[in-house]
Amino acid sequence: MFKTVFAADIGSKCIKCVARGQVAAEETAIALEAGAKLTVAAAGNAALLHRSGVIRPVRDGAAANTRMLALLLGRLACEKTGKRTTASIELHAAIPHMLPTVKQNALKQAARLAGFRALQVHDPLLMGAIGADADLFSDRAHMIVNIGAETMTCAAFANGGMLWQGFSNEGSAAVDRAIQNWFRDEHRLLIGERMAEIIKQNLNKLSFDIEGRSADDGLPQTVRANGAELRAAAQKGQTALIRFVKDAVKALQPEAAADLLDTGITLIGGGALQFGLAECFSRELPEIPILTAKNAVTAVADGMN
């Protein structure tokens, strides 16, 4: 008998969904009907079309609002599988084993509240390694780094097993904050998270016309910023990411660390696509090849597919 399966890699900003063999990336956001507490108006990317009432139920890689996350998972699962309810759908969720137990339980509770028939939990690092076509059964160690919006995870694999894994509460949002701080300090301009994210995705441009609010008089203001200066500001935000990976390499056994000289480090996750990030890693770890997976954003979901 065939069963309906919906798989989800739940991130703070983006949820990668797998259903019917197809992988899709959706915003981790839900919009409620005006005046209704639990009536969903839209979920995922469609939720951002609503100017008000948009809720982001995941923070720091964990469920900040369990009920809203349950509604989001249920809505996306029904949309992607074509089912009317979640009662016949089996949920496969990627939940980091190194998350504190309380945060793991919150994610699992959201899945239960959504009414899925069953819940299967997978390690996102293992799924990401499979999705990125890493050779897990090689006798030489290979490292995978998953860079999310607000968290980072890292693991080294060899001989079909995990040699080491680590977790950090710093993610690509650290770069957003560095950009926001730069505008505040250099131009007395206040910008939001969404604008900082747009800037981060376009750091290869020569200049930017940025709209924000003046920190002096509170009125709208436009500032033209130099791209080179912004790239320098972004690199300050990347310091924590680089430090985490360097500490991960130092934590390996000497033989496993030496293997990385040939096998390298593979970056996955949405944060891996930041302009200049791979080059920063290469400068700090010049002897180790730094690779960005072609399917970096959906690697974990591809591994579960």
Where are these regions (language model features)?
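Positively charged, low-complexity, intrinsically disordered RNA-binding extensions
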Residues: 153
